[in-house]
């Protein structure tokens, strides 16, 4: 586990974004942990989050020309990541996002920010069913000269969907692009094992992974 990954897990726990207990997911599964990126909801938290995304981009080595933040949750994530890349990695890259509803006046269209062209790195919080990413792929494919380079998310739950694959594996298979994450469940388990105060949650998370993991 990289230092930034350990720091991210601690940061997510401290902010209440990553919690342990008993939670019912939209899928109906009862999960021993819950991740809610919407709780990175202050200026300092967003700045720090952007630095973690930027670190994961550098670590991934994925080449790209523009960052794309899917509406709505991906918008502040892409903005914060673009700032962090410029300030901490001397990589001043363009970014853009989509509107849910196209505007008939002003700029017009459904895209805002830099032109969506070249290799596009999509920034989002998690991939649950893959539906949102499939919508984003349609947007990218509709732009001349644009193609998806990959997807970066905060947490990979490493969890099967209805079939044998996870939603992330299905996206990778269907679109031929890498999906990378700041951390995955593997690192969360490692963090729990190393933390005396949180180790009590390890058996439940391990059991959940044994049942639903990939």
From Swiss-Prot:
- Which EC numbers does the record give? 2.4.2.10
Q: Which cofactor does it need?
A: Mg(2+)
CDD domains for this protein? PRTases_typeI (cd06223)
> What keywords tag this UniProt record?
Glycosyltransferase, Magnesium, Pyrimidine biosynthesis, Transferase
Q: Name one GO molecular function term.
A: magnesium ion binding
**Pfam families per record:** Pribosyltran
Q: Which domain of life is it from?
A: Bacteria
Chain residues that bind 5-phospho-alpha-D-ribose 1-diphosphate? 26, 72-73, 99-100, 103, 105, 124-132
Q: Which family does it belong to?
A: Belongs to the purine/pyrimidine phosphoribosyltransferase family. PyrE subfamily.
Subunit architecture? Homodimer.
Which function does this protein serve? Catalyzes the transfer of a ribosyl phosphate group from 5-phosphoribose 1-diphosphate to orotate, leading to the formation of orotidine monophosphate (OMP).
HAMAP family, from UniProt? PyrE (MF_01208)
Protein name listed in UniProt = Orotate phosphoribosyltransferase
